[in-house]
Structure formats: C-alpha cells, structure tokens
C-alpha cells in the first residue's frame, strides 16, 4: 500500500495541475477562453445530461460480463443482473469501496489509480508463471550442454588416436606403392629395351627374306615385310643417338633398295611385256586404227590388277620416304613411255585417215578430230586410274604431246582457209562445242586437250581477223556495184508487184503460202533480224512487209557487213570485235554514200536520199542487238609544238642564246617546249551511223522543202532585201507597184506553189512508202517538211497582209492555211 501511495503522489500532482489549468478557462474576470452566454447555457445543459449517463445501448451485455470477468477478481454467476447499477456495485465491492462515493475528480483519479494497480498485478501474474516455467527449461539445457561438452572431449581424444593409426597406415601404404612403382618402371624399362631392340633384330629376318630365291612381290608376306622394313627405317632415322646408328641405317637402306628393285623390275617388266605383245600383232609397228585402240585398252585393263596393289603400296609411302617417290616417278615414266609408244603411231594414222576423209570439209574434220582426241584423253585418264590412285602432271604432258599431232595437221589447213563462213563456224565449233560443252564439263580429264584447242582457236581467230580485214577492203570498201544493185526504185516496184500478185493469189487459194512467208536467202537471214522500222521494239506484221525489208533486197555491202558482224560477234574477243565493227561500218557507210550519189545521178535525188535513209535505218536497227560498244580509241602523236620549237631554234636570232647559262637558253627551251603531245581519239560507229542518218534526213527535208516552196522563199527574200534597202535610207517603195510583185504575178506564184505541192506531194509520199513502208517512219520524216511548208505559207500570208491591200489580196487568192493543211495531211 505504501508503494501504491508513492505512485499516486506524482499522479495527484499532475491532476492538480490539470485542474488548475482548467480553472483558468473559466476564471473571472480574466478568462482564458471566454464563452458567450449561449455557449455557457449549452455547457450547463450538457453537464445536466451527463450526470445520469447510462451504459451505451450498443454495448452487448455479454461483452460487459466478459470485461467484468477478466478485470475483476470476482466470480460472476450464470445469472445476469437485471440492472447496470448492480454490476457497478459488485465491482466496487470487489475493490473494497462499496462504502465510498466518488463525488470529486480527485476521488475518481484515486479510484482509477487503485483499479489500474490491481489490473497490473493481475496481468503480471501469468508472466511470472511463464518465467518460472522457462527457468526450469534453462536448467535442463545447461545439463545437456555439460553432457555434450563431455562427449566432445571424448571424441577429440578418439580423433587423435585415429589420426595416429591413420598416419602409420598411410606410411605403410606409400612404402608399398613406391615398391610397386619401382617394379613397374623396371618392367617398362625391360619392355622398352626389348621393343627398341626388336627393330634391330628385324634386320636379319628381313635380309634373309630378301635374299631368298623364292621371294616374289606378289607373295602374301612381301607387303607385311615391306611395312616392317619401313617402320624400322623410320624408327632408326628418328633416333640418331643410338649406338651403331649409321651401320644399321645403311644396312636397312640396302634392304630397302633390294625391295624397291624387285618391285620396279616386276612392274616395268609387266608393262614392257604388254607393249611388246601388242606391237607384235602388227609387223609394221603401226597398229590398224580400227581395232588397235580396243586391244590397247583391253590388254592394259586386264593386266592392271596384277600391279595395282603393289603400286598402291608405293603411293602410300611416297610422301614419307623419298625412295618410294623416286620409284613411283620411274613407274610413271615407264607407263607413259609405253602408252606413247603405242598411241603415237595410232593417233597419227587416225588423224591422217580423218584428214583424207574430210579433206574439203574443214568443219567436219575439226569435229571428228576433236571428238577422237576427247575420247583418247578420257580413255587414257580412265586407264591411268586403273593402275594408279594419285594423279601426275606427266600424264597431261603426254596427252598434250599427243594433241600436238592433231594441231600440227590442222594448223596448215586453217591458215589456208579464206572463207569467213568456214572460219566463223570453226570458231563456233572450237569455242562452243568443244571448250564449253566438253572441256568445261570434264575439265580434269580434258585439261591437256583444252590447251591444244585454245591454241587452235587462237589461230582460227587470228586467221578470221586477217580475212575479215581483207574482206572489208575487197568486198565492202572496194565493192563495185552492178547495174542491178543500183536499179532503184525499179527493183522495189517489181518486188511490190510480185508481192501484190502473190497476195491476190493467196486470197483466191487460202491454203497456199503467202509472200509474207517466203524468206529470201534463208541461210543467211537466220542470223539477222528483219529491219526497216525506226522502232525495232514494235515490228510490223509480215503482211505489211516492205520489199526493201527483205534480206535479199538489201544493198550488198549492207548485207555483207551485217552478215560479217553477226559471224564475228561470238567468235572473237570484244575488243577485237569493236575494232573490226568500226572498220566494217565505216566502209559500209562510205559505200552507201557512193551508191546514193549514183542513184541520185541515174534516177532522182529523192531516190538516192531515201535509199541512203532506208539502209542507214537498217544498219542502226541491225547493230542494236550486239551488246557491245562500237567505240575504239586511236592514239596519235601531235608534233606541232616540236615543229614550232624547231623552227624557232633555227632562227638566226636565237643562235647567240645557245651559250647562255640561264633559263633563256635556246636549247633548254627546245627541250621543254618541243615535247610532242599524245592525243587520244574515240571513234564510235553507232554514233557515226546516227550522224549520217541525221544528215541524210536533214538533206531530204531541205530538198523537199525547196522543191515545194522555193519560189515563195525567193520572193520573200527579194521583199526582205527591198525592206533592208529602204530602212538603210534607200527610196521608199510600194510592193504592189514593183514589176515582179504585181498582184497578178504574185497570184501566179502562189498558184504555182500550190499546184507543185498538189502534183508532186503524192509522188514524194509514194516514194517514201515504197522505200520505208512504215507509217510511223514516214510520218516522222515528213513532219518537218510539212512544218517548213506551213511556216513559209504563214510568212507569205503575213507579208500579203502587211504589203498588199485587201483588193490585191483577193486578186492574189493565196490558198488558206486550212486548205494547205488538208493538202499536206498525212495519216500516221
């Protein structure tokens, strides 16, 4: 109780301070929180209502009972009191305060402190019980820890004893292992010595076998003995520090030489025996070409298994031991010598027979000769593979040597061929049929043959280029046209009539072929496309074909040029083709210009111009499919500066400057300024064709314009001269009063021009249709002519309005522009 009283002292002091502070709120007259009268009345009403505050209605009776049972040390009966006052009375009774009354705040705080102390004591009871319970467990754990420490001490003692025993046992085990290791090393040393001595001990065994008279390279024990000999040599060679190393190595080498000699003798004798047997079949040593090759290959293939196993062993060892490589080379040489001895005469005989059979047909000769050599090369490679497994370059050398015999026969024939068709066909055979079709598909076996074919192809191409130069000079540049070649437009009219008659017959008999299905010079035209249209991408149907478009109707130099280029295109290199094409096209253009002049002299100027335009169009269209540049570069030396410098140094005024020791020395100036210049010129044949075509079209347009409106242009030129004189101070004029410009004469002039157009225009259009036979081309070519005529008439109309009165204009009666347009109308 004394402790409780001590605890209540500070609490009572705190309550007193609180009450004093609360009193300050209400103190008069200095109030800390003054209230209004209304607020004061409200507080009094609340105080009166709070004096008899009941237990909250929402608090269940069960909770109240539970709270009471936990907080108060009294036993509640199962019967719930009927009123709250009974419950409170029992609570105060349990605290010994049933006689006390709480009327002031101090009494309430005292009661509350007492109640709280009682509750704290009740609450601490269970913790004290738990503390006592846990203390018991702690004592038990301390006892267990003591037992564990005792067990650990016993285990530590046991571990020390175990380590002592283990160390003793390990020492014994290591001693045993060391003894076993020494025993194993001694055994290995003995085996190693025995293994090394075995290579030396094999010498006597191998030497005995090699000296045996019954030893054969085909026996079962020869190959194993050979392998053992190789192993011994390899081993001894790799240990030069052994005792008696040079002696044993020399002895083993001698054994190897004996074995190699036996193998070489057997193989060489086998091959030579085969050759001698085959040669004995023909006393003249030149086997019959019909059955010789069959015997050559059958006999050798039958004998191949006898030596193939032995040769395989040699090839396997050739990379490691030089003696085997030398033996393999000797066997290769022997084999190839025997094959050359057999094949050389037979190939020469066969080539001679082919030459005699195809003496006049060079293409057939080249085809048959190349096919024969292809079979020979393939058969030789297959036969070689029957004997050997590794390739050798000596086989290709032999085949190249055999192919030279074919080349030696063909070359004299090639260099005497003069026809471009034959030479181009030979190029096609060698390049396409032989190199591309055969050699590329089997390059390994035909490599040697390809070298000879390439040399032959180069000779043919060289001959083709040479003959092409001559052909261009003789048949194009030097071509002398026959009268029939220049019979234009007569031949076109005749062919048109023939075509029309055939077309009429076709209408009568539909089953017969029309003229459009007839191809002239079919053999040559297969390599060329039909031409004549300015737009090759839009060819005309064959039913509207022009006679000038037929291959046979082309001017001979054009036909020859295009045929020549078509044959050269796939036969020679692009650079060479560019040079030849430029030369051929230039010569062809010059021949066309000459033919055009001749036709213009013999017939009319329009025929010559249209002839030139038509054939230039053909040239431009036909060279378009050649996917190459028709450009060549020419290099020239310009000596103009050298000449000027030489003249300058020869001038007497410069002689004193020869000996000057400065930059004004004449000799130094000559060396610096007189250096010749190298100039490069590019010649483009396609642009040359286009340039001449443009020039021909411009000449045609100018000539036709002059034909139709020349008099009007002369009249307007006079008027312009008259105006110029007047503007420069000359006498004034009245154009209608000039003798040559009177309305009646101007009327005659306009009527004559209109009549000329009306009468000669159909002739011009007819000629264009006959030569060009293409509405698009005709429209494009005639359009500038029509525009020029219209421009002249427009200027003429403007001149009439400016210089003549309306009455004079009516007298002149110049055709209107609408009339002129209708007259010049050409449907596209």
From Swiss-Prot:
Protein transport is among the record's keywords: yes
Membrane topology (UniProt): Peripheral membrane protein
Pfam families associated with the record: COG3_C, COG3_N
Mutation effect (residue 37 to H): In CDG2BB; uncertain significance
Cellular compartments annotated: Golgi apparatus, Golgi stack membrane
Keyword entries, A-Z: Acetylation, Congenital disorder of glycosylation, Golgi apparatus, Membrane, Phosphoprotein, Protein transport, Transport
Tissue distribution of the protein: Widely expressed with highest levels in pancreas and testis and lowest levels in lung.
Any one GO cellular component localisation term in the record: Golgi apparatus
Bias kind Polar residues: ranges: 525-543
Listed result of changing residue 620 to C: In a breast cancer sample; somatic mutation
Coiled-coil region list: none
Effect of residue 42 to P: In CDG2BB; uncertain significance; decreased retrograde (Golgi to ER) transport in homozygous patient cells; decreased protein levels in homozygous patient cells
Family of the protein in this entry: Belongs to the COG3 family.
Disease: Congenital disorder of glycosylation 2BB: A multisystem disorder caused by a defect in glycoprotein biosynthesis and characterized by under-glycosylated serum glycoproteins. Congenital disorders of glycosylation result in a wide variety of clinical features, such as defects in the nervous system development, psychomotor retardation, dysmorphic features, hypotonia, coagulation disorders, and immunodeficiency. The broad spectrum of features reflects the critical role of N-glycoproteins during embryonic development, differentiation, and maintenance of cell functions.
Protein name stated in the entry: Conserved oligomeric Golgi complex subunit 3
Species this chain originates from: Homo sapiens
Lineage: Eukaryota, Metazoa, Chordata, Craniata, Vertebrata
Gene expressing this chain: COG3
């Amino acid at each position: 109780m004394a402790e409780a009283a001590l605890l209540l002292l500070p609490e009572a002091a705190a309550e007193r301070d609180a009450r004093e502070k609360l009193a300050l709120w209400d103190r008069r007259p200095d109030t800390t929180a003054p209230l209004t009268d209304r607020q004061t009345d409200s507080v009094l009403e609340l105080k009166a209502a709070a004096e008899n505050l009941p237990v909250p209605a929402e608090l269940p009776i069960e909770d109240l009972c539970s709270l009471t049972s936990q907080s108060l040390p009294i036993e509640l009966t199962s019967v719930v009191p009927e009123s709250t006052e009974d419950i409170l009375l029992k609570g105060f009774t349990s605290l010994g305060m049933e006689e006390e009354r709480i009327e002031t705040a101090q009494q309430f705080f005292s009661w509350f402190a007492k109640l709280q102390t009682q509750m704290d004591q009740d609450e601490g009871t269970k913790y004290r019980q738990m503390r006592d319970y846990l203390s018991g467990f702690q004592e038990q754990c301390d006892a267990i820890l003591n037992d564990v420490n005792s067990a650990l001490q016993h285990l530590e003692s046991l571990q020390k004893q175990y380590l002592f025993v283990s160390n003793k046992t390990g020492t014994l085990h290591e001693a045993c292992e060391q003894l076993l290791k020494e025993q194993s090393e001694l055994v290995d040393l003995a085996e190693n010595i025995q293994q090394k001595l075995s290579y030396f001990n094999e010498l006597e065994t191998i030497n005995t076998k090699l000296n045996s008279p019954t030893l054969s390279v085909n026996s079962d024990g020869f190959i194993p003995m050979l392998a053992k000999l190789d192993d011994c040599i390899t081993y001894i060679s790799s240990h030069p520090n052994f005792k008696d190393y040079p002696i044993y190595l020399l002895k083993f080498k001698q054994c190897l030489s004996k074995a190699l000699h036996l193998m070489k003798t057997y193989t060489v004798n086998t091959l030579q025996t085969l050759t001698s047997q085959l040669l004995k079949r023909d006393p003249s040593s030149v086997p019959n070409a019909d059955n010789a090759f069959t015997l050559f290959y059958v006999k050798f293939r039958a004998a191949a298994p006898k030596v193939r196993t032995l040769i395989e062993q040699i090839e396997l060892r050739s990379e490691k031991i030089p003696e085997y490589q030398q033996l393999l080379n000797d066997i290769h040489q022997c084999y190839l010598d025997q094959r050359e001895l057999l094949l050389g005469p037979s190939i020469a005989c066969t080539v001679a027979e082919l030459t005699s059979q195809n003496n006049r047909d060079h293409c057939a000769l080249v085809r048959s000769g190349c096919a024969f050599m292809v079979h020979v090369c393939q058969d030789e490679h297959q036969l070689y593979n029957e004997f050997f497994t590794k390739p050798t370059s000596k086989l290709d050398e032999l085949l190249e040597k055999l192919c030279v015999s074919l080349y030696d026969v063909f070359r004299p024939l090639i260099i005497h061929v003069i026809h471009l068709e034959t030479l181009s066909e030979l190029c096609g055979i060698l390049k396409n049929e032989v190199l591309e079709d055969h050699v590329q598909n089997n390059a390994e076996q035909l490599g040697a043959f390809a070298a000879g074919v390439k040399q032959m192809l180069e000779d043919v191409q060289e001959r083709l280029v040479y003959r092409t130069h001559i052909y261009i000079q003789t048949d194009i540049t030097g071509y002398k046209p026959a009268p029939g070649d220049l019979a234009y437009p007569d031949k076109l009219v005749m062919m048109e009539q023939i075509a029309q008659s055939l077309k009429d017959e076709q209408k009568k008999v539909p089953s017969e072929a029309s003229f459009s299905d007839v191809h002239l010079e079919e053999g040559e035209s297969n390599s060329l496309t039909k031409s004549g249209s300015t737009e090759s991408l839009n060819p005309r149907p064959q039913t509207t074909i022009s006679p000038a478009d037929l291959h046979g109707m082309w001017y001979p130099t054009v036909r020859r040029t295009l045929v020549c280029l078509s044959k050269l295109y796939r036969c020679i290199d692009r650079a060479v083709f560019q040079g030849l094409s430029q030369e051929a096209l230039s010569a062809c253009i010059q021949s066309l210009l000459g033919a055009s002049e001749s036709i213009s002299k013999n017939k009319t100027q329009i025929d010559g111009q249209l002839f030139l335009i038509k054939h230039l169009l053909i040239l431009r269209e036909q060279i378009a499919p050649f996917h190459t540049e028709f450009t060549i570069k020419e290099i020239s030396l310009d000596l103009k500066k050298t000449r000027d410098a030489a003249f300058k140094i020869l001038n007497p005024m410069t002689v004193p400057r020869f000996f000057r020791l400065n930059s004004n020395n004449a000799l130094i100036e000559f060396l610096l300024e007189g250096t010749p210049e190298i100039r490069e010129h590019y010649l483009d044949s396609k642009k040359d064709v286009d340039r001449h075509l443009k020039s021909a079209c411009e000449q045609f347009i100018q000539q036709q314009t002059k034909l139709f409106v020349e008099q009007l242009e002369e009249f307007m030129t006079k008027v312009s001269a008259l105006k110029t004189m007047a503007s420069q101070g000359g006498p004034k004029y009245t154009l209608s009063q000039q003798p040559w410009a009177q309305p009646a004469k101007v009327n005659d002039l306009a009527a004559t021009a209109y009549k000329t157009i009306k009468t000669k225009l159909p002739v011009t259009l007819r000629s264009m249709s006959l030569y060009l036979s293409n509405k698009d081309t005709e429209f494009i070519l005639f359009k500038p002519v029509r525009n020029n005529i219209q421009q002249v008439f427009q200027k003429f109309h403007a001149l009439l309005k400016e210089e003549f009165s309306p009455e004079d204009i009516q007298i002149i009666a110049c055709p209107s522009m609408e009339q002129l347009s209708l007259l010049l109308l050409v449907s596209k």
